[in-house]
Amino acid sequence: MAHSKTRTNDGKITYPPGVKEISDKISKEEMVRRLKMVVKTFMDMDQDSEEEKELYLNLALHLASDFFLKHPDKDVRLLVACCLADIFRIYAPEAPYTSPDKLKDIFMFITRQLKGLEDTKSPQFNRYFYLLENIAWVKSYNICFELEDSNEIFTQLYRTLFSVINNGHNQKVHMHMVDLMSSIICEGDTVSQELLDTVLVNLVPAHKNLNKQAYDLAKALLKRTAQAIEPYITNFFNQVLMLGKTSISDLSEHVFDLILELYNIDSHLLLSVLPQLEFKLKSNDNEERLQVVKLLAKMFGAKDSELASQNKPLWQCYLGRFNDIHVPIRLECVKFASHCLMNHPDLAKDLTEYLKVRSHDPEEAIRHDVIVSIVTAAKKDILLVNDHLLNFVRERTLDKRWRVRKEAMMGLAQIYKKYALQSAAGKDAAKQIAWIKDKLLHIYYQNSIDDRLLVERIFAQYMVPHNLETTERMKCLYYLYATLDLNAVKALNEMWKCQNLLRHQVKDLLDLIKQPKTDASVKAIFSKVMVITRNLPDPGKAQDFMKKFTQVLEDDEKIRKQLEVLVSPTCSCKQAEGCVREITKKLGNPKQPTNPFLEMIKFLLERIAPVHIDTESISALIKQVNKSIDGTADDEDEGVPTDQAIRAGLELLKVLSFTHPISFHSAETFESLLACLKMDDEKVAEAALQIFKNTGSKIEEDFPHIRSALLPVLHHKSKKGPPRQAKYAIHCIHAIFSSKETQFAQIFEPLHKSLDPSNLEHLITPLVTIGHIALLAPDQFAAPLKSLVATFIVKDLLMNDRLPGKKTTKLWVPDEEVSPETMVKIQAIKMMVRWLLGMKNNHSKSGTSTLRLLTTILHSDGDLTEQGKISKPDMSRLRLAAGSAIVKLAQEPCYHEIITLEQYQLCALAINDECYQVRQVFAQKLHKGLSRLRLPLEYMAICALCAKDPVKERRAHARQCLVKNINVRREYLKQHAAVSEKLLSLLPEYVVPYTIHLLAHDPDYVKVQDIEQLKDVKECLWFVLEILMAKNENNSHAFIRKMVENIKQTKDAQGPDDAKMNEKLYTVCDVAMNIIMSKSTTYSLESPKDPVLPARFFTQPDKNFSNTKNYLPPEMKSFFTPGKPKTTNVLGAVNKPLSSAGKQSQTKSSRMETVSNASSSSNPSSPGRIKGRLDSSEMDHSENEDYTMSSPLPGKKSDKRDDSDLVRSELEKPRGRKKTPVTEQEEKLGMDDLTKLVQEQKPKGSQRSRKRGHTASESDEQQWPEEKRLKEDILENEDEQNSPPKKGKRGRPPKPLGGGTPKEEPTMKTSKKGSKKKSGPPAPEEEEEEERQSGNTEQKSKSKQHRVSRRAQQRAESPESSAIESTQSTPQKGRGRPSKTPSPSQPKKNVRVGRSKQAATKENDSSEEVDVFQGSSPVDDIPQEETEEEEVSTVNVRRRSAKRERR
């Protein structure tokens, strides 16, 4: 080098002009002054100044001496560093320094000076910046690449720059630092791990949070050098992740944080690292997998991340972790879902399936977080979540765990409020989530008080927010009510009813507290507190808190007065809110932030505060209805047809008239209702009448102008209106007018005189009107009514068949096809029953005569005159009317006493009628009477006969009714411990003697030792005993055993001297005993009480007689399988294994498709007629239900079981059997002239047989709205469905001869459904409910028709009858009708129909709970289950000619 030569030749240092020598001999100030001049000189020099470069070479060398590099003064060091930086610039590309050590010292010196950049306020900062700019621009540090210690230099430089960068620096400082550092990475041969660490450490979250500028600097550097640094980053991760060499760097423990940061900075940095993560996702180390999952959740979920589309294998591998065995990993995956849904809607499809499985996870926290994730995304934008995802939230509203259910319900409520009420995303979004309102209200059918309270809270805050202005609130309620489905409406009605009931309970409590303290009042207060407690969560704590609250009410008059205002019927919504605020304020304690006592009282106040309805609200609601009537409302905008809105508005007002009658007392309200009465829409006028009936008690006194306008309308309605309006008009007059006797007389007289049996169309309304007058004012018209019944009702109507019925093979037709004459006869029967119920006595023997008449109708299969004029559908209607009438009369004690055992047993056979609808409606009426504790206990025994029903859904319905009735009685006994004298009529176990007696007298049970008949008896007994024995409360198994033993010591009171009858009784007892012994392990213990047997049914036990004989044939032993009975209320396990997915909800239409009349009765050789029940072992059913549904009534549990429980194991269906004759000659009708009529027209030996097996449609007059919608579809198939035999008698379908085992298999196995109570308003007219109930059968009729080969059909026929009857309508055996020709065992042909068992059961393998409410009705119409026959054998049944049948 040239300088070197000079250096060697000449050691003299040349200073710039004006600068004297710089040495240690001068002062610091002077040195600084001289150095500044040197800096200026070097600053002005450029690389081309060769002379100056030569001139100042020695100065350059001198400035790099240790004297300067180690000078104590920072100003000196800074100036020297600036000079050195310029020297590197001027002399580039060669530096004047050749010694590697010297170079290292110089660069380490410059690096140290860069620390001065830290203080941006320093007067020297600009000079520090100049230094940085200079070395960055010249890339001076690149000289170090050739040095051995270069790594140390670079590392120190990087550390220095990262440590000094701060928010005081401008963009230029940042840029120069990046330039300086990036040149080292991009132009160097390698990047050491140490150097890499100095960069990456700034990305670690802890450092990142400490120094955001260092993070930004590192980020900018990595972006700039991505391509160059990527191999070194890859190597680092490879060493740590794949080879496990964590010692190579202190950052090894932060690899996953670093990967995330690097991915966010530039995904190219990790091109080779991401495949390594796929490997790590499959690691055996739980914690390691968890770390990777957390990392990838952030990477996939980041807003602009394209990782899922760029790296599909990694995405799929990640999705697999949703099913990881480690709970925290699944939890992490689920939490990630919401970010992913919000930031990447395109991935929702991939996530849906995995979230579906996780929504059924065994871990509560995971199910909970699935809901949170979906709801969070939905609240951001409803379009982010598809219907499947929302459906997962819907399913979880039935979860086993309260926390999960609560989250799901609240989530749906928030979504509903945002998108349906506030229309945050337009009408399409509102339609998408329209189902939420129904679903939330359906939850009110749950047993849990927590669920029901939450529904009430949701309703008040999210569905109809109580803080809305009155008009807006009522508009919201009006359109909500108009768009709810039937079950949601019932739930909402039930909610108001429960709140109203609780309000009255609290009012009663306040009245009791105000009374003077006595032992009686203290007991009454305690009793009332217990009742209120049952309406609050956590009854144990609630009881203590309610006692405390009672004490507060006694002591604090202010709180008591506030509460009195709150429960007053005149309390306004604003007042209610004020009262609640005041009471909670007084009870609160600022020092106690969490106050469980206050929380409980808040629950109570929330339930009783009328926050929606007051007089102003009713007025606003009426105005809203009037707007719809006038056509000025926004009905169409709200998506509700005007007619539907008006009808729903009136229905809503009708319900509120039960719960808030005082709120209707305004002239404006009554005037609007009067206008509604005059409308053409029958339903609207009907509702208006009911509202008047409920609210009109003060009309006479307070609103005389309304009274005078209303009276003529009521008169007109009662004389010429539709039947239901006539009924309500009579009840209105009874409720409103003090001169009711006069009014009734003005109506009764003209109607009575104008009754004309030849004018059938105009008879129905008068009969309904007279019937209700007779019910409400029996004494006023006692004589004319008796004469009317004896002459007109019985002689002219019931004993006359004026017109021949249409010839049809159907067993049931819709209302409009029923002959007018039959409709009149049905009303005539109802009128007689109302007359008797009004009288409430049998002094004139009218009850006895009526019962004989009704049983004669049953005996004659509905054809009272037996002239053969009445069509089969009409006969079905009359049988149903007669059976229902007996059940109605049995609810009145004076008539129950006169119903003979033979009449009771005959009535019981209606539950096995051949027509599906007769069985269905009769069962509902029976259930209604039993569940209200109105029917005596022996009527519950009738349910046992349902075990013989060929249609599985009927058996399921009967079972649920039985469970509900048993629970109702048990609950009643718990709450009324003092009613021990009524134990015999209430204790469910006492149904066993009645059941045994009924089965012993079953006309199907003919041969005492017949195995097949005994197997039927066993099935019927087990149908009842299984539910009774599900819990061995108070040692009930031993009690039942003792009862059965006691019966064997008695004789049948119905025929004490009939040896065969008594033998049957003892045989049935032995069947029961064997069931008890095979299913119970505690039956042999001592019975807690000595049972009392009903004296009407059994003689007194003979103490001298010990009946230890076993009456069962030995072959029966094999039919009693040991094992505990299944519990009736099963709350299944929370979930299936991890891979399971929930079962699809069953649609309304799918459940409506049931077995039809044609398939179940009309053709014995058709598959539906001969279905047996599946052995429960064949049903591979999941019990994995999450939560039961039940009646909304508190404390009344319902049954929830899978189909295998409902379908009891049975090999064969019963054969037709001989019937016990009834001596009709001995029965007299009681009215002299009537006796002859009945006996003349009743052929000798006329008998009634039990018939069996149809599904079909139903009456329209009192039809549920949704059933009407279904009717049109159903009726299309009527011709095929309802074709019974021409001369077929009702009875159970014959068994397959030769011991075949037909089976039935459900096509879709619904999950267990809770029975639901009809949740109408409190105490509606029983008549009204009854009429409505008769309208619930139409929907249940559609079914698959199975083809049977003609050849098989012909084989099933007897040669002697085939010529007489068409092959299309083969009769089933009449019950008890002996066939003249014996039925030998003939060869039979098996026809296989339907799927294999495996196919049917496969659907159920992953069964979760179904949306129990979808399309289901309350307990009065328990949900239907679709059935399909799997394996069917054709049966050989002897046909008989008409003569032989009628012998």
From Swiss-Prot:
<dbReference type="GO" id="GO:0008283">
    <property type="term" value="P:cell population proliferation"/>
</dbReference>
<feature type="modified residue" description="N6-acetyllysine">
    <location>
        <position position="1136"/>
    </location>
</feature>
<feature type="modified residue" description="Phosphoserine">
    <location>
        <position position="1383"/>
    </location>
</feature>
<feature type="compositionally biased region" description="Basic and acidic residues">
    <location>
        <begin position="1196"/>
        <end position="1214"/>
    </location>
</feature>
<keyword id="KW-0597">Phosphoprotein</keyword>
<dbReference type="GO" id="GO:0005654">
    <property type="term" value="C:nucleoplasm"/>
</dbReference>
<feature type="modified residue" description="Phosphoserine">
    <location>
        <position position="1176"/>
    </location>
</feature>
<feature type="compositionally biased region" description="Acidic residues">
    <location>
        <begin position="1422"/>
        <end position="1432"/>
    </location>
</feature>
<dbReference type="GO" id="GO:0005694">
    <property type="term" value="C:chromosome"/>
</dbReference>
<dbReference type="GO" id="GO:0000775">
    <property type="term" value="C:chromosome, centromeric region"/>
</dbReference>
<feature type="modified residue" description="Phosphoserine">
    <location>
        <position position="1366"/>
    </location>
</feature>
<feature type="modified residue" description="Phosphoserine">
    <location>
        <position position="1417"/>
    </location>
</feature>
<feature type="modified residue" description="Phosphothreonine">
    <location>
        <position position="1370"/>
    </location>
</feature>
<feature type="compositionally biased region" description="Low complexity">
    <location>
        <begin position="1379"/>
        <end position="1388"/>
    </location>
</feature>
<dbReference type="InterPro" id="IPR011989">
    <property type="entry name" value="ARM-like"/>
</dbReference>
<feature type="compositionally biased region" description="Basic residues">
    <location>
        <begin position="1342"/>
        <end position="1353"/>
    </location>
</feature>
<feature type="compositionally biased region" description="Basic residues">
    <location>
        <begin position="1437"/>
        <end position="1447"/>
    </location>
</feature>
<keyword id="KW-0007">Acetylation</keyword>
<feature type="modified residue" description="Phosphoserine">
    <location>
        <position position="1162"/>
    </location>
</feature>
<feature type="modified residue" description="Phosphoserine">
    <location>
        <position position="1259"/>
    </location>
</feature>
<feature type="modified residue" description="Phosphoserine">
    <location>
        <position position="1319"/>
    </location>
</feature>
<protein>
    <recommendedName>
        <fullName>Sister chromatid cohesion protein PDS5 homolog B</fullName>
    </recommendedName>
</protein>
<keyword id="KW-0677">Repeat</keyword>
<feature type="modified residue" description="Phosphoserine">
    <location>
        <position position="1140"/>
    </location>
</feature>
<feature type="compositionally biased region" description="Basic and acidic residues">
    <location>
        <begin position="1172"/>
        <end position="1184"/>
    </location>
</feature>
<dbReference type="GO" id="GO:0042127">
    <property type="term" value="P:regulation of cell population proliferation"/>
</dbReference>
<feature type="modified residue" description="Phosphoserine">
    <location>
        <position position="1191"/>
    </location>
</feature>
<keyword id="KW-0539">Nucleus</keyword>
<feature type="DNA-binding region" description="A.T hook 2">
    <location>
        <begin position="1287"/>
        <end position="1299"/>
    </location>
</feature>
<feature type="modified residue" description="Phosphothreonine">
    <location>
        <position position="1367"/>
    </location>
</feature>
<dbReference type="GO" id="GO:0008285">
    <property type="term" value="P:negative regulation of cell population proliferation"/>
</dbReference>
<feature type="modified residue" description="Phosphothreonine">
    <location>
        <position position="1255"/>
    </location>
</feature>
<dbReference type="GO" id="GO:0007064">
    <property type="term" value="P:mitotic sister chromatid cohesion"/>
</dbReference>
<keyword id="KW-0132">Cell division</keyword>
<feature type="DNA-binding region" description="A.T hook 1">
    <location>
        <begin position="1249"/>
        <end position="1261"/>
    </location>
</feature>
<feature type="compositionally biased region" description="Polar residues">
    <location>
        <begin position="1355"/>
        <end position="1372"/>
    </location>
</feature>
<dbReference type="GO" id="GO:0051301">
    <property type="term" value="P:cell division"/>
</dbReference>
<feature type="compositionally biased region" description="Basic and acidic residues">
    <location>
        <begin position="1265"/>
        <end position="1274"/>
    </location>
</feature>
<feature type="modified residue" description="Phosphoserine">
    <location>
        <position position="1257"/>
    </location>
</feature>
<feature type="DNA-binding region" description="A.T hook 3">
    <location>
        <begin position="1372"/>
        <end position="1384"/>
    </location>
</feature>
<dbReference type="InterPro" id="IPR039776">
    <property type="entry name" value="Pds5"/>
</dbReference>
<dbReference type="GO" id="GO:0005634">
    <property type="term" value="C:nucleus"/>
</dbReference>
